């Protein structure tokens, strides 16, 4: 697949009026193909293999928050990156998830071509599915290169999305605690 992608990048470079055989661009198609495969490796991962049984019994029933998980993803509309951070909170119901698994879940879904709104929902639903928590809240704050580098060219703009499930959606106090912890 890398060879086919590299050939496609070679055609794109030539289509832009550049010489793909000139010194600075000679290896660019291969490098770009490898980069794209890395940036979209989430397609080859599953939630089950990623979590790998790292769900543990716990009597904890208070909110657990993992803040500032760095992420980058590819906008499905322009194939340009969006870069930001994700905050995940959940209310355990007898089980907790290994801490590193939250970052791995974020990475798995972020490393696919999509929009931020869907990414936020995918992360929330995955955490809910794995933990069977009483509630899950996810907030993503990101800057989109498709809006910063082209189109309206607004370099200081950012987008925030949230998904609230269970108690985070139905209980205003729980939602407010989450928002205060994230922004406080």
From Swiss-Prot:
Pfam families: GTP_cyclohydroI. PROSITE patterns: GTP_CYCLOHYDROL_1_1, GTP_CYCLOHYDROL_1_2. GO terms for molecular function: GTP binding; GTP cyclohydrolase I activity; zinc ion binding. It catalyses: GTP + H2O = 7,8-dihydroneopterin 3'-triphosphate + formate + H(+). One of its GO terms (biological process) is tetrahydrobiopterin biosynthetic process. Its EC number is 3.5.4.16. GO terms for cellular component: cytoplasm. Gene3D superfamilies: 1.10.286.10, 3.30.1130.10. Zn(2+) binds at residues 75, 78, 146. Toroid-shaped homodecamer, composed of two pentamers of five dimers. NCBIfam families: folE, PRK09347.1-2, PRK09347.1-3. Belongs to the GTP cyclohydrolase I family. This is GTP cyclohydrolase 1. The gene is folE.
């Amino acid at each position: 697949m890398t060879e086919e992608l590299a050939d496609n990048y070679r055609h794109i470079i030539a289509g832009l009026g550049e010489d793909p055989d000139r010194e600075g661009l000679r290896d660019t198609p291969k490098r770009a193909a490898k980069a794209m495969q890395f940036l979209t490796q989430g397609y080859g991962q599953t939630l089950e293999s990623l979590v790998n049984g790292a769900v543990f019994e716990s009597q904890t029933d208070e909110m657990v928050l993992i803040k500032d998980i760095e992420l980058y993803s590819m906008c499905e509309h322009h194939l340009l990156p969006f870069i930001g951070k994700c905050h995940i909170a959940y209310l355990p119901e007898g089980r907790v998830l290994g801490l590193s698994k939250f970052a791995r879940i974020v990475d798995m879904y972020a490393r696919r071509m999509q929009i931020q709104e869907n990414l936020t929902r995918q992360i929330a639903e995955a955490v809910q599915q794995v933990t069977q928590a009483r509630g899950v809240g996810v907030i993503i704050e990101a800057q989109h290169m498709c809006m910063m580098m082209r189109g309206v060219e607004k370099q200081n703009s950012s987008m925030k999305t949230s998904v609230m499930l269970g108690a985070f959606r139905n209980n205003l106090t729980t939602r407010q605690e989450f928002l205060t912890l994230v922004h406080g």
